[in-house]
């Protein structure tokens, strides 16, 4: 027994599970859509101080301008405490005419030609043709429990936490347990001699700005409906806490993407995160994300996303498996085993 599902439905299920009932109670359905995110204020894109051929040149230039970086202590380092959620960003405008979060993975948008290399532009046109035909990209890597990776991490609309220390910064996303570790004042190290979903990130502080260089990233995409990235993708980010017109905290990330196999020249965008004290008040916490043993979605022969349902031989019970189902206390939900 199989059923055709849209990726939009699958994404909604994941979002509800990730953010919890408290999030759903606080925001309306419309308020959590990409269209509403696209209406949120977003700062102007800040281009690099001059053109750079590589991320390494860009990063080292900023490091020199910062005289080696600010040496923070635990008493001086910026604190980005609390829970955060993704806001608006300008990335779709790199690849689409009048691109925004409202049309990034929906039909009707026109591709900007001459941004991608010929081979990657050809692939992007094929992806957008699928969006035009079916109203969406039929299959997304997340369906197979693959990591969103960089740069998709910057936008993923889930709960995040940021912890800054003098020697490291931890950027934690509840989706897929994706924690970015930025090693402050360090060099890139790759003892495994391979690429990674989140790459390898080093950084330095320039006052209250955190500058980050990420490389060795697995090929992925910018987000569903957007172009692919290659295994030569790198990016340079600057992170800074600001306040919007209402006085609310926000994190602003100015980023430049470098990808010689996919981009004709480096491209820049700005991303934002909103402080969400309401989530903390409602008791939302980041939990361990579990996907591989509970996901019943898969890619069908026609390229669409389908789901196994109870009764299918391949169906996996999201409550898990036990050799002793009759033994009290073996359920993953302790409510069912509570004494009456």
List each model region and its residues.
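Bacterial N-terminal signal peptides
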Residues: 10-18
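Sec/Tat signal peptide C-region and signal peptidase I cleavage site
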Residues: 20-24
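Bacterial N-terminal signal peptides that target proteins for export
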Residues: 1-10
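PEST-like low-complexity, intrinsically disordered acidic/proline/serine-rich tracts
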Residues: 25-340
């Amino acid at each position: 027994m199989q059923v055709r599902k849209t990726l939009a439905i699958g994404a909604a299920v994941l979002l509800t599970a990730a953010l919890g009932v408290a999030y759903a109670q606080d925001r309306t359905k419309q308020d959590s859509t990409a269209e509403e995110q696209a209406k949120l204020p977003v700062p102007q894109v800040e281009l690099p101080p001059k053109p750079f051929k590589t991320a390494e040149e860009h990063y080292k230039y900023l490091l020199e301008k910062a005289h080696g970086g600010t040496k923070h202590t635990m008493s001086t380092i910026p604190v980005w405490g609390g829970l955060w959620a993704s806001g608006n960003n300008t990335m779709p405008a790199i690849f689409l005419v009048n691109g925004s979060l409202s049309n990034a993975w929906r039909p009707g948008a026109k591709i900007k030609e001459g941004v991608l290399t010929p081979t990657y532009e050809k692939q992007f046109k094929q992806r957008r043709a699928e969006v035009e035909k079916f109203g969406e990209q039929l299959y997304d890597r997340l369906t197979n429990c693959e990591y969103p990776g960089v740069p998709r991490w910057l936008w993923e609309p889930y709960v995040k936490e940021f912890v800054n220390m003098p020697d490291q910064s931890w950027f934690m996303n509840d989706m897929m347990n994706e924690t970015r570790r930025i090693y402050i004042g360090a060099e890139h190290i790759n003892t495994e001699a391979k690429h990674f979903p989140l790459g390898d990130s080093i950084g330095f502080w320039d006052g209250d700005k955190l500058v980050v260089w990420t490389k060795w990233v697995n090929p992925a995409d910018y987000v569903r409906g957007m172009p692919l990235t290659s295994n030569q993708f790198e990016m340079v980010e600057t992170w800074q806490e600001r306040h919007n017109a209402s006085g609310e905290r926000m994190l602003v990330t100015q980023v430049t993407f470098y990808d010689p196999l996919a981009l004709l020249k480096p491209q820049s965008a700005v991303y934002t995160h909103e402080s969400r004290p309401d989530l903390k008040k409602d008791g939302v916490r980041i939990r361990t994300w579990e996907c591989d043993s509970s996901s019943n979605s898969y890619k069908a022969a026609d390229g669409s996303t389908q789901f196994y349902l109870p009764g299918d031989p391949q169906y996996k019970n999201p409550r898990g498996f036990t050799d002793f189902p009759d033994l009290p206390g073996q359920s993953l939900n302790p409510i069912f085993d509570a004494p009456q």
